[in-house]
Each structure stands twice: as structure tokens, then as C-alpha cells.
């Protein structure tokens, strides 16, 4: 985020986190500030109390800036230190809890005290570059497997990489931390909540203990601008709408009550420009196929059901494409049991468009991911037979005809994007 200040404006200092290399005095709990200075306030690890000068003079100015865009998680509290704040005495609580906020306060007099001149969220937050590579992993043939296949920035699928994690099927995967990926949940012979992180070189890590209820047939997608993700829906004995958030380090949180119709096999994908996402389609508790959708805000809040568009179906796949925040949901199986290759565009406002005739072999229980920054790929799946075919998606959202497959034919797998480097 760029902050432009006029000549003679307060100098910005850096406080409230341990970054001594920047020259500031580290303090993660509280900081007494001086008049006519500016401060970067980093609340990544904890809340911070800002104590204002005890004897301010008229015209004194202080600027406080949310360094890590984390005030929404860990707020700051203003201690006016005996002076009034917006006309209220020091006994009033003054808190700021909006990510990306910039607070510019000026001291007026003994009556009004400190008055905010600006109290705005910085909207033009830096946006991470799109990922360049992808990974398909795990799945089922005649038994579960743990093999993976990398996808280069040119859309070429590599041969099998030997399994590292426990073989499983009906799992989910998503990007996290900006340039990394995570596979989690699924069925290893019984339902599982273990996870396998993927670093930004595409190396799959060994099994790590999971969090949340062991489930299968969920879906997952990243959200926001801080490298976070969400796993939602699925089943364990019964269908659920529960969700598990993932932080930017790949740690999965415990179960949280969800929103929308409980179901299995939805499809999830990003849309928009600031980290929104959508879950769509699936099979509900009455075993009916649905075309409803649920939007995810860039803070990870899952919305209630939206009106359905397109043919009710499940076991579809989705990828982003282009540079204007659009996505594509395609393939799957409909309520009549027929596999399809139709596609539905998701606009940058999260609206799902009607069915459009597709390309490539109709199939379901496949996976998809973005690659090359603005393109996508659908691969593997089952229909008339288990396959390893792939279909590339160009930056305009056009699905290409079949590409001869590479890697072990399988279905019930998952895929995600990773790496900022081509």
C-alpha cells in the first residue's frame, strides 16, 4: 500500500511488532506515541494499545496505519491519556478494528480534544500475483492412490510423482498462502481429516494431523488477500454445511457452523478481484442434485443459498480464467445419471450464467486448476471409462478439445494452483 504525504507531514515510524531491522522500538502490547509523528501499527500477533501524549498542544497530529492489514483480527485501542477524544472524556473506549485502516488525528482544544481527520480503509491493497503452476493429486482407480501430477505454466501435465501422503479419494484441495497448496480430508478406507501441504516448488509434504471432523466429498477454495482458504460441506454419516477455515500457514481450524443447504460434491472457485469465492451445485440430504450456490466474502463468510442457475448436477470441477475475475464450472453428472460437458461462466460479480455447450469428453468426478496466470485445465475423471484426458481453458474461457492424457487414469481426485514463478 502506498501512502502519500505532503511536505512537512509527520514522519512514519514502525512499532508494535518485533521488526528491529526497520529501526523502530519493538512493542507488541502497547506504545506511547509522540505528537507530529506517524506509526505503522502491526497487530499480527496481538492487539495493541496506543497511548496518546499527556499534554498535547493545539494542532498536534498523529497518524496510525494498519501495517499488516490485521486490525480486523487484532484491534487497536486508543488511550487518550487524560484528554478528550471527539468530545468524550478518557473513560470512553476508543477502538479501531477495520483491516487496512489509516487513522489521522489532530488535537483541537480541551473541549473536543483529539479529532479524527481521516478514518479510512485503504482500498487499493496489494493483490498477490496469480499462480503459474498446478497440481493434481490422489484419487481412485480400483483402489485409492496418492500419486500426483504437476502442471507446468504451459499447461503440460507431467507424469506421475510417487505418493508421499496416504492414499485417499474424495478429498479436496485449494491454494493457500498465496503460492502454496493443501490437500485435506477425504477417505483413506475410512473418513479422514489429515492434510498434506504442497510447497511453492510443488513438493507434497507427508501427512499432518488434521483438525475438524473427518469428512469426505467436500470442496475447498482460497479467499481474501491474505492467503487464507475454506473447506466446506461434505459428509460423515450425514451431509453437512460445516466449514473449516485455513490460515496463511496452512493450519486448518476446527469446525464452524456453516450456511446454506447441507450437501456433498459441490464445486468451489474464486471470482472477482479481491478474493471472493463461490460454492455451487452438489447433492443434498434427500439425494437430489441441486444447482444452488453460496458466495464467500473476502473475509471467509459463507452466505446463504443463492438461486440456482444451470442444470442441477454434481461432481463438477472449476477454474478461474482471464484477468477480469471470471471463472468456469464444467463437466459433471446430472440427475438422470448422464455425464455432461456443459459449462457455466461465473462473472466477476459471482453470478452463474446459464448452461453453454461444452467441449471435450463428457465425464464427472474430475478436477481442475488454473495455470499460467490466466488459464485453466480440467483433467482426469470417469464416465464411459476412467480417463486421464485433459482439456485446456484459454484466457477467454474457451474449453479446448481433448488432449491425450498423461499420468494414471483416475477419478475422485483434487487439484490446486501453486507458485508465482513460471
Language-model features, listed with the residues they occupy:
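Glycine-centered loop/turn motifs
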Residues: 35-38, 59, 100-101, 305
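Beta-strand-rich extracellular modules
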Residues: 17-21
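Short, positively charged, Gly/Tyr-enriched micro-motifs
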Residues: 23-25
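Kelch-like beta-propeller repeat domains
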Residues: 93-96, 104, 119-422
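A short, polar/charged loop/turn motif at coil->beta-strand junctions and beta-hairpin connectors
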Residues: 33-36, 72, 128
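Acidic, glycine/polar-enriched metal-coordinating patches/loops
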Residues: 1-15, 44-124
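Short beta-strand edge segments in extracellular beta-sheet folds
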Residues: 27-30
Amino acid at each position: 500500500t502506498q501512502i502519500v504525504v505532503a511536505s512537512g507531514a509527520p514522519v512514519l515510524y514502525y512499532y508494535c511488532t518485533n521488526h528491529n531491522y526497520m529501526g523502530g522500538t519493538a512493542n507488541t502490547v502497547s506504545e506511547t506515541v509522540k505528537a507530529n509523528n506517524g506509526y505503522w501499527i502491526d497487530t499480527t500477533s496481538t492487539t495493541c494499545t496506543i497511548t496518546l501524549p499527556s499534554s498535547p498542544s493545539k494542532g498536534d497530529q498523529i497518524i496510525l496505519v494498519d501495517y499488516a492489514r490485521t486490525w480486523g483480527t487484532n484491534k487497536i485501542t486508543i488511550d487518550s491519556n487524560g484528554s478528550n477524544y471527539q468530545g468524550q472524556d478518557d473513560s470512553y473506549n476508543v477502538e479501531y478494528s477495520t483491516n487496512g485502516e489509516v487513522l489521522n488525528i489532530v488535537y483541537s482544544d480541551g473541549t473536543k480534544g483529539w479529532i479524527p481527520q481521516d478514518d479510512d480503509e485503504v482500498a487499493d491493497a496489494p493483490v498477490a500475483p496469480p499462480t503459474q503452476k498446478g497440481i493434481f493429486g490422489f484419487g481412485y482407480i480400483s483402489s485409492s492412490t496418492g500419486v500426483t501430477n504437476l502442471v507446468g505454466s504451459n499447461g503440460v501435465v507431467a507424469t506421475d510423482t510417487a505418493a508421499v501422503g496416504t492414499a485417499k479419494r474424495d478429498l479436496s484441495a485449494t491454494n493457500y498462502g498465496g503460492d502454496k497448496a493443501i490437500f485435506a480430508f477425504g477417505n483413506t478406507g475410512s473418513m479422514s481429516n489429515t492434510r498434506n501441504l504442497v510447497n511453492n516448488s510443488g513438493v507434497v509434504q507427508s501427512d499432518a494431523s488434521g483438525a475438524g471432523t473427518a469428512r469426505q466429498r467436500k470442496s475447498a477454495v482460497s479467499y481474501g488477500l491474505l492467503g487464507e482458504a475454506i473447506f466446506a460441506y461434505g459428509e460423515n454419516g450425514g451431509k453437512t454445511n460445516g466449514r473449516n477455515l485455513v490460515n496463511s500457514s496452512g493450519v486448518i481450524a476446527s469446525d464452524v457452523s456453516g450456511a446454506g443447504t447441507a450437501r456433498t460434491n459441490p464445486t468451489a472457485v474464486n471470482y472477482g478481484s479481491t478474493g471472493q469465492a463461490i460454492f455451487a451445485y452438489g447433492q443434498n440430504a434427500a439425494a437430489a442434485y441441486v444447482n444452488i450456490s453460496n458466495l464467500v466474502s473476502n473475509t471467509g463468510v459463507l452466505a446463504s443459498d443463492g438461486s440456482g442457475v444451470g442444470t442441477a448436477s454434481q461432481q463438477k470441477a472449476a477454474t478461474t480464467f482471464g484477468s477480469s475475475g471470471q471463472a468456469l464450472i464444467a463437466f459433471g453428472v446430472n440427475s438422470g445419471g448422464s455425464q455432461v460437458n456443459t459449462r457455466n461462466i461465473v462473472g466477476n460479480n459471482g453470478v452463474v450464467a446459464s448452461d453453454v455447450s461444452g467441449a471435450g469428453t463428457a465425464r464427472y468426478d474430475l478436477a481442475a486448476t488454473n495455470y499460467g496466470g490466466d488459464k485453466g485445465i480440467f483433467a482426469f475423471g470417469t464416465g464411459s471409462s476412467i480417463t486421464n484426458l485433459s482439456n485446456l481453458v484459454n484466457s477467454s474461457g474457451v474449453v479446448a478439445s481433448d488432449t491425450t492424457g498423461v499420468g494414471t487414469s483416475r477419478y475422485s481426485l483434487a487439484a490446486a494452483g501453486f507458485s508465482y514463478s513460471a
